[in-house]
Every structure is written in structure tokens, then in C-alpha cells.
From Swiss-Prot:
The active site is at Y22, H102. The record marks R17 as: Transition state stabilizer. GO terms for molecular function: 3-dehydroquinate dehydratase activity. One of its GO terms (biological process) is amino acid biosynthetic process. It comes from Helicobacter pylori (strain J99 / ATCC 700824) (Campylobacter pylori J99). Pathway: Metabolic intermediate biosynthesis; chorismate biosynthesis; chorismate from D-erythrose 4-phosphate and phosphoenolpyruvate: step 3/7. This is 3-dehydroquinate dehydratase. Belongs to the type-II 3-dehydroquinase family. Homododecamer. Keywords: Amino-acid biosynthesis, Aromatic amino acid biosynthesis, Lyase. Pfam families: DHquinase_II. Substrate binds at N76, H82, D89, L103, T104, R113. The keyword Lyase applies. InterPro entries: DHquinase_II, DHquinase_II_CS, DHquinase_II_sf.
Length: 170
């Protein structure tokens, strides 16, 4: 399964940006940790990473995923979480599971950070666990996609399903 990981504004500055809040781990190190998690778990997962500081590029990337071989999206929209209805709309149009990740617990921060338009559009939000949150999102995504595939397989094999090829034989 192929999963797109989208990183928003200022995440390229991890390791330098307010280490008291975000720690010393860089974005590249977070991506390496995710790749290691995939390898150690022997998961059949291909990760693609994308980082931008521009709202429109995040929207473009989500839209590009529509009809592609990406099965899910893990996104940290950064501060756009609190301001971007446009990214939230793109998430709702993605047609695939989307999980939002935040390194910090946005509910424990400034009042203006407590609302997440993008989080409301996602299937779930993981926050406050630092870099571990990305592996938590990855684990959740793998399980969600496995459940979806199992459900689709069960539907396909259901003799009462009008789309079952057995029911179309004459």
C-alpha cells in the first residue's frame, strides 16, 4: 500500500524551531523513523514524503492523490490547521482515509491553535506525542486500510451482493 505523508509550513525547520515545544528531531529524522518502523514491522507500505510552506501546494498534492495509487494520507498541516478551510475542503474531496498529526498537543496551547479546520475533515487526529505520533498515525492507517480491504473482499464474495460475478451468470 502506498501512503502519502504531507508536511506543512515550518516543519522543515524542526530541530531548530523552539526545541522546548518540538524537540531536536529534524523532519528528515522523522521520515527515517517512519521508514524504520515500516521495515521493522515488515509492513507492505511505501511512503512518499512531501513538504511545503505553501497552502496551495498542499491542496495541489491532495488533489493529485485523487484517482492515484495512494491509498491514504497522513498530514501535518502545521499552522494551516487553524486557518485553512481550503485544505479542509481538499481533504474532504480526497476520497481516501486521511489522518492529521501534530507534534504538540494543540489543545494545550494558545487559544487560536485549539481549533483545527483540517482535523475536523480528517478521519482522526493524533497530537501531543512528538515524532511518535507519525508512527501512531502510520499504524492506524495500515489497520484502517486493511479493514477497508477486508470489507471490500467480503462484499465482493457476498452471494447477496448484486455486483458479485456469481449473480451475473446466466
Amino acid at each position: 500500500m502506498k501512503i502519502l505523508v504531507i508536511q506543512g509550513p515550518n516543519l522543515n525547520m524542526l530541530g531548530h524551531r523552539d526545541p522546548r515545544l518540538y524537540g531536536m528531531v529534524t523532519l528528515d529524522q522523522i521520515h527515517e523513523i517512519m521508514q524504520t518502523f515500516v521495515k521493522q514491522g515488515n509492513l507492505d507500505v511505501e511512503l512518499e514524503f512531501f513538504q511545503t510552506n505553501f497552502e496551495g501546494e498542499i491542496i495541489d498534492k491532495i488533489q493529485e492523490s485523487v484517482g492515484s495509487d495512494y491509498e491514504g494520507i497522513i498530514i501535518n498541516p502545521g499552522a494551516f490547521s487553524h486557518t485553512s478551510i481550503a485544505i479542509a475542503d481538499a481533504i474532504m474531496l480526497a476520497g481516501k482515509p486521511v489522518i492529521e498529526v501534530h507534534l504538540t498537543n494543540i489543545q494545550a496551547r494558545e487559544e487560536f491553535r485549539k481549533n483545527s479546520y483540517t482535523g475536523a475533515a480528517c478521519g482522526g487526529v493524533i497530537m501531543g506525542f512528538g515524532p511518535l505520533g507519525y508512527n501512531m498515525a502510520l499504524m492506524a492507517m495500515v489497520n484502517i486500510l486493511a479493514e477497508m480491504k477486508a470489507f471490500q473482499e467480503a462484499q465482493k464474495n457476498n452471494p447477496n451482493n448484486p455486483n458479485n460475478p456469481i449473480n451475473n451468470q446466466k
